[in-house]
Amino acid sequence: MREKRALLLLTALSLVLTLLAGCGNTAPDTGEKTMVIGDTTFNSENWEETVDPHRTYNGWACIRYGIGETLVRYTDSMELEPWLARSWSNDGDRTWTIVLQDNVTFSSGRKMDAAAVKQCLEHLLENHDRAPGDTKIADMQAEGQTLTIVTSQPNPALMNYLGDPYGCIIDVDASDFEKGIVAGTGPYVVQELVTDD
């Protein structure tokens, strides 16, 4: 009985010492930070033929790869917050006024203003199967950094839909849709898109 207790105590002590030894930090903290810059490869079996957010569900790739951003985004608590839009308001019916962030440029170098966003949303409505029915956009007017959208019927969820990945704002003029490459406002630029690699 005494031997069992001694063995149990010795085993417990060994476990505690092993745990404490594993928690130690032998490397000194130099305060230096390392930044590695290079190619970023994501999804080693890439099935996306394009990162054009206005084609099928490729808006997810556009955001995931850091190429594009939307006018609004969702917080962790699923509330809308500004991203490329600075603010927005609705007259309670069909007219929305969206004020855009200043000093945002596309990877092409073009300034993101209301005219560029209007052109982008027109391209979205012409090419995406869900966007026209979701957004119900009937008309848009652009002036400086202010975009006015009129919907065909009241649509209180308009900003939610513009936060969908298909709503990534891209420079339509600088995008190469044949190669599947778009110019967005995100921190990364597409150089080449290789599918099924």
Can you name each region flagged by the protein language model?
Residues 1-35, 49, 79, 123, ...:
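Short, low-complexity disordered leader/linker segments with a strong preference
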Residues 38-91, 183-185:
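N-terminal lobe/hinge region of extracytoplasmic solute-binding protein
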Residues 62, 66, 79, 83, ...:
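Extracytoplasmic/secreted proteins, especially bacterial periplasmic and envelope-associated proteins
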Residues 15, 37, 71, 87-88, ...:
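Residue-level signal for nonpolar/aromatic packing positions in well-ordered secondary structure
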Residues 89, 132-178, 186-194:
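Surface-exposed binding/hinge segments that line
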Residues 30-32, 66, 83-85, 91-93, ...:
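Extracytoplasmic
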Residues 86-128:
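Aromatic- and charge-enriched surface segment that lines or borders ligand/interaction sites
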Residues 31-43, 95-99, 117-120, 147-149, ...:
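Short, well-ordered beta-strand elements
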